[in-house]
Amino acid sequence: VEVRTRVWYNPDMSSEVFMIPGLIGLVLQFQATLLTSSAIVRERERSTIEQLIVTPIRPFELILGKILPYAVVELVVVAEVLLVGTLWFGVAIKGSLALLLAIAGLFLISTLAIGLLISTISKTQYEAFQLSFLTLLPSVFVSGFIYPIAAMPPALQLVSRIIPLTHFLVVVRGIIIKGVG
């Protein structure tokens, strides 16, 4: 009897195949949170928030106007990372590209919301920047981007479940590597 180990979905054990999907989520979260976290606090620092409040637009329109440009920029970034990953590193997207973009859009909404929350509770742009990094650093180490969640202590596994990047990475790796969707 000969025992052979078979690696599914990444038989060459290529690190690019594992890292490129994770990089999409990391870049999305990093940029979206940092950019959005300064959106409202910048207006407060410049004392223009009062002018925005008295305009005839509704609060929802104000928030949408603040985050929509960042959402468009981030969707372009997703396309760029996918293009570089596919053309430069040879990582093939085995699943549905439309599903991948839809999931990226949902994840983008959550990261923009986190950035907006940071922006509304911060008093200065520097404080918003620090709070953004406070949320980003655990995401890098606990989300499964670098270390497998199964190898983490139970307490960190619980923490990983509340981080949006964890769930995004599972889905995106499923779409790109396994061909889900």
Predicted regions mapped to residue ranges:
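Transmembrane alpha-helical core positions of polytopic small-molecule transporters
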Residues: 26, 30-31, 42, 74, ...
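Transmembrane helix-boundary elements of multi-pass transport/secretion proteins
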Residues: 1-100, 121, 127-130, 151, ...
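Membrane-interfacial helix-loop-helix junctions in multi-pass membrane proteins
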Residues: 9-12, 92, 143-181
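Alpha-helical transmembrane segments of integral membrane proteins
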Residues: 25, 106, 126, 157-160
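Pore- or pathway-lining transmembrane helices of multi-pass membrane proteins that form conduits
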Residues: 126-143
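Hydrophobic alpha-helical transmembrane segments of polytopic membrane proteins
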Residues: 100-122, 140-143
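Active-site proximal loops enriched in glycine and acidic residues that flank catalytic Cys/His/Asp
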Residues: 66, 122, 133, 163, ...
